[in-house]
Amino acid sequence: MKVSYEELKSEFKRVLLSRNVREDIAEECATVFADTTQAGAYSHGVNRFPRFIQQLENGDIKPEAQPTKVLSLGAIEQWDAHQAIGNLTAKKMMDRAMELASQNGVGIVALRNANHWMRGGSYGWQAAEKGYIGICWTNALAVMPPWGAKECRIGTNPLIVAVPTTPITMVDMSCSMYSYGMLEVHRLQGRQTFVDAGFDDNNNPTRDPATVEKNRRLMPMGFWKGSGLSIVLDMIATLLSNGESTAAVTEDKDDEYCVSQVFIAIEVDRLIDGKTKDEKLNRIMDYVKTAEPVDPNQPVRLPGHEFTTILADNKANGIPVDDTVWAKLKSL
C-alpha cells in the first residue's frame, strides 16, 4: 500500500502524543521518522517505529532529555546524550560537528549514552547537503558473531561516509552484509537476499532472512574484514566518547541503549576551490559510471545516488508501506 507523507507523519505524532511525549518534541520526532521513510529507508523509518515505541515505554528513551557538552578540545568535543531520542540527538550532533568544521576546517563530536539513531545516512546526507564531507558511525548491541565464532560478540556498527557531489554520493552500511532491518524487509516481501546474509544452524551460508533473524548469525561484510571493522569502530567510539562499548551495552544493559557515536564534518572548500573540486569529483563519477556493465539493463551507479530518485518518486506517488507494518502502526 501507499500513504501520503502527511498521513504517515500524523500517525507517528499520534502515537508519540499518546505516550505523553511533549507536543514540540513529538512534532520534530514524527517529522524525522516521516522524512526517513519518504527517503526510502523503510527499514529504519516506519518499520523501526514500533521498536522505538517499545523502548520509549520501557524507559530506555527519555523524550525530554537534551544532550550536554562534557569536554571541548578545539575541533573535538565530547557530549552526553542522557538517553535522549536518538535521531533528534544525532541531527544536533552533526550540526555541531559542522559548526566546529566552519571554525577549524574539521569538527569531531563524540557522543555517549545515546539511543539508536535510526537511519545513520540521514546525518551524513545532512552534512553533504551543506557542502561538508560527513562521516559518522555508532556502536551497538552485540548482534553478530565475530568471524569464526557462533556467538554474538560484536555490533553491526553502521558507518556512513557522504561526499557533497551532485547528486550526493554516500555509503551507508552496517558491518554485516545485511542489517536486521533489511532482513525484515526481504522477509516481508517474501524473497531471499541477493547474496549470503548469514549462516544456518549447520554452519552453511544462507540467503533465507528468517533463518538469520532467528539464529542471529549474521554474515560480516567482507567476512573477516567486516568483523575487524566493527571491532575498531567500537573501540574508537568508546574511547572518543568515554562511553559504553558493545561489550558493556550487551552485558550491562537489558536492551540497546547508552551506545556511543561519532560525528565528523570536514569543510572541504577550505582545501580546494569549488571549480577544481567539481572537476575532480565529476571525473571520478564519470569514470566509474562509464564502466561496461555486466547487464546492459543495469547501468553502473554510484552509492547513494538512487535516493534522489526514490525521494522524488515517493513525493510524487506516495510512500510504500508494508500492509502488516501499517496495521501495526495503526494499532499502537
Curated annotation (Swiss-Prot):
Binding sites annotated in the UniProt record for NAD(+): 168-174, 224-225, 304-306
Keyword Oxidoreductase in annotation: yes
Location of the active site: 44 (proton donor)
Coiled-coil parts of chain: none
Main subcellular location: cytoplasm
Subcellular location: Cytoplasm
Superkingdom in the source lineage: Bacteria
Pfam families associated with the record: Ldh_2
Family named by the database record: Belongs to the LDH2/MDH2 oxidoreductase family. DlgD subfamily.
Subunit field text: Homodimer.
Known role: Catalyzes the reduction of 2,3-diketo-L-gulonate in the presence of NADH, to form 3-keto-L-gulonate.
UniProt name for this protein: 2,3-diketo-L-gulonate reductase
